[in-house]
Swiss-Prot record:
This is Polyribonucleotide nucleotidyltransferase. Disulfide bonds: none annotated. One of its GO terms (molecular function) is magnesium ion binding. It is found in: Cytoplasm. The lineage of its organism: Bacteria, Pseudomonadati, Chlamydiota, Chlamydiia, Chlamydiales. It comes from Chlamydia caviae (strain ATCC VR-813 / DSM 19441 / 03DC25 / GPIC) (Chlamydophila caviae). Its EC number is 2.7.7.8. Pfam families: KH_1, PNPase, RNase_PH, RNase_PH_C, S1.
């Protein structure tokens, strides 16, 4: 293969470079994509399937090598293993960007591998990975409908920025990753700080201009070194099979769609499919089980589309903008800190909010270093939620992706950590699913936060929008069901309040989605959110004013950073003593912010008093409860703060004359003393007598 390099300038100082022909020459396609000193290598390989399948077997694995930043993993095992959450989310971004660009009925097993080989800590690698994978696909012999590219868009100082640096992202009000072809958008994912629908559209249009530029460069690379596409890998569905199935099911879908309950509908649909397979199977060689099932799915999709297009009626009988019935039960679980049973149609979640100290925070490590997440949402999708038997174990990619979307949606409404110093964990337990369980997680999670007494800024709701695009006829659907997601052209999830958007995610199965269509979808989503928010406010108008009796109490105090070692003590001895004596949990960060959590306010006050005693500075004129450390003929030495000891002269014990100090106090006694002065040697003059009149 010929070595080739292509340069694409997006903005000043941001040039994307594609190289091929030097590395991994036995792969179907391989590209090294780089910007600045962030380099991402991507490869694609395909193998013919032994047995045809009715789905696209695309597998994407993205990995961030720690060697890319000159580090080696700690611990006994030194090689990268189980993917991190960030790697899984990036793998999903690449998959969702590439899948629409691959043809239906592609009978090849396609594997995408993408590795971060060099990371400069400035240029974020995920949009580079999307572009690198697309370029590798473009120059390979794997069939592809169209070339794809991806970018990240930020909103910094009221200006749109393409592929913002890490520093820019830290202050950006939006994070948007989008992918598309030269003429259309295929995938978007992002979150923002209550930006308007108009601003989101503006960001998408801004990003798409740069996507088009990158797509043209990838096409240039394809023309120079691209392999001939393997058209034999695409096995189209014979028209005879489709027409025969269409004729057989004519009139049967009307009866099928009278069944509104999901499980009953699926059972009847499978029975009808079975009848079709039994009738046509082996009628001739083109009537395979796979072909018949594919034709049945297409016929079902065509009928659903025609029903919407011609009668404005959906498969479950709803109108285009109708949202399924919603029921809400807050404080659903008696011993949790906050909970909510949220049901929308046949989609349901039990959302739970748990409050804790910093020790409960989620710790993680990636190429940008170690981090601590004090808010996180975990999404659980057990097989019983769809009436199936399945594997239970570590979360799948879908669970992680859905949880992160709901987490981002709610993160923008959380209170200032300085005013509410709790770690917040939400779990969304999906107990029923028929479309849009991630948006149910947003609604249920928000209500669980409010039920727990978290003083959120504003309630947040989420809704999933769908699209039926037939030539020039466009229909936008509110609150799509699982069937509409499966057979429709778009899944557009939007979360926020009535004033702005906090998170969004869109996947498109067809080209032709224009900014006008997206604008209409966002406007319809806003009306849907308003409807859902009104119902949520009826159930719980505002966050509860008091925390649950079962939630820990947390208070913070600030100490000087140079006093941290004093509080911790040698080998942690001092802080362990405070924790044991007061019955609290203590966390101290590098800035000296001390977080104290306990089940009672009294325990917190005791711990604060002990810490203040360790780090406090002595003040002339202040009264201290000191401990008598030793007695001498002329008085007693009293420790007023740890390590700070002064003399209370015999004349300062009482207003009456005393002959023997030992008759007045004993070693170890607690004695109230007032600090009268500090001499030039730093010695403390104490008086018990001065406290008697106060």
């Amino acid at each position: 293969m010929t070595f080739e390099t292509i340069f694409v300038t997006l903005e000043e100082g941001k040039t994307l470079v594609f190289e091929t022909g030097k590395i991994a020459r036995q792969a179907n396609g391989a590209v090294l994509a780089r910007m600045q000193e962030t380099w991402v290598f991507s490869s694609v390989c395909a193998a013919n399937l032994e047995e045809p399948v009715d789905f696209l077997p695309l597998r994407v694995d993205y990995q961030e090598k720690f060697s890319s930043i000159g580090k080696t993993l700690g611990g006994f095992i030194k090689r990268e293993g189980r993917p991190t959450e960030r790697e899984i989310l990036t793998s999903r971004l690449i998959d969702r960007s590439m899948r629409p660009s691959l043809p239906n009925r592609l009978m090849q097993d396609v594997q995408v591998l993408s590795y971060v080989w060099s990371y400069d800590g400035v240029t974020l690698p995920d949009p580079i990975a999307i572009c690198g994978v697309s370029a590798a696909l473009a120059i390979s012999d794997i069939p592809q409908i169209s070339v794809v590219a991806g970018v990240r868009v930020g909103f910094v100082n009221n200006s749109w920025v393409v592929n913002p640096t890490k520093a820019e992202m830290d202050v950006s009000r939006m994070e948007l990753v989008l992918a598309g072809t030269e003429n259309a958008i295929l995938m978007i994912e992002g979150h923002c700080d209550f930006l308007t629908e108009e601003q989101v559209i503006e960001a998408i249009e801004f990003g798409h201009k740069h996507i088009a530029t990158i797509c043209r460069a990838i096409k240039d690379l394809q023309q120079k070194v691209g392999k001939k596409k393997n058209s034999d890998a695409i096995v189209p569905l014979p028209e005879e099979v489709q027409s025969s199935v269409n004729t057989f099911v004519e009139g049967k879908f009307a009866d099928l769609l009278k069944i509104k309950e999901k499980k009953a509908f699926e059972a009847a649909s499978k029975q009808l499919e079975k009848e079709i397979v039994e009738k046509f199977l082996e009628e001739n060689e083109i009537f395979t089980a796979l072909n018949i099932k594919t034709a049945f799915k297409q016929a079902k999709s065509d009928y659903m589309r025609a029903l919407i297009r011609e009668q404005s009626v959906r498969s479950d009988g709803r109108a285009i903008t109708t949202i399924r019935p919603i029921s809400i039960d807050t404080s659903f679980l008696p011993r949790t800190h906050g909970s909510c049973l949220f049901t929308r149609g046949e989609t349901q979640t039990v959302a739970v909010c748990t409050l804790g100290s910093e020790a409960m925070a989620q710790r993680y490590e990636d190429l940008n270093g170690e981090g601590l997440a004090k808010f996180y949402l975990q999404y659980f999708f057990p097989p019983f939620s769809v009436g199936e038997v399945g594997r239970i174990g570590s979360p799948g990619r879908r669970e992680i992706g859905h949880g992160k979307l709901a987490e981002k949606a709610l993160s923008h409404t959380l209170p200032d950590p300085a005013k509410f110093p709790y770690t917040i964990r939400i779990e969304s337990n999906i107990t029923e699913s028929n479309g849009s369980s991630s948006m149910a997680s947003v609604c249920g999670g928000c209500l669980a936060l409010m039920d727990a007494g978290v003083p959120i800024k504003t309630p947040i709701a989420g809704i999933a929008m769908g699209l039926i695009l037939d030539n020039d006829h466009v229909t936008i659907l509110s609150d799509i069901s699982g069937l509409e997601d499966y057979l429709g052209d778009m899944d557009f999830k939007v979360a926020g309040n009535t004033e702005g958007i906090t998170a969004f995610q869109m996947d498109i199965k067809v080209e032709g989605i224009t900014p006008t269509i997206m604008q209409a979808a966002l406007a319809q989503a806003k009306a849907g959110r308003q409807h859902i928010l009104d119902i949520m406010k009826e159930a719980l108008a505002a966050p509860k004013t008091d925390l649950s009796q079962y939630a820990p109490r947390i208070e913070t105090m600030q100490i000087k950073p140079n006093k941290i070692a004093t509080v911790i003590g040698p080998g942690g001895k001092q802080i362990r003593q405070i924790i044991e004596e007061a019955g609290v949990q203590i966390d101290i960060n590098d800035s000296g912010l001390v977080s104290i959590s306990a089940s009672s306010p009294q325990a917190i006050e005791k711990a604060k008093s002990m810490i203040e005693g360790l780090v406090g500075e002595v003040e002339v004129g202040k009264i201290y409860e000191g401990r008598v450390t030793s007695i001498v003929p002329f008085g007693a030495f009293v420790e007023i703060l740890p390590g700070k000891e002064g003399l209370c002269h015999i004349s300062e014990f009482s207003k009456q004359r005393i002959e023997n100090v030992g008759d007045f106090v004993k070693q170890g006694d607690i004695l109230a003393v007032k600090l009268l002065s500090i001499n030039e040697k730093g010695q403390y003059k104490l008086s018990h007598k001065a406290t008697l009149s106060e």
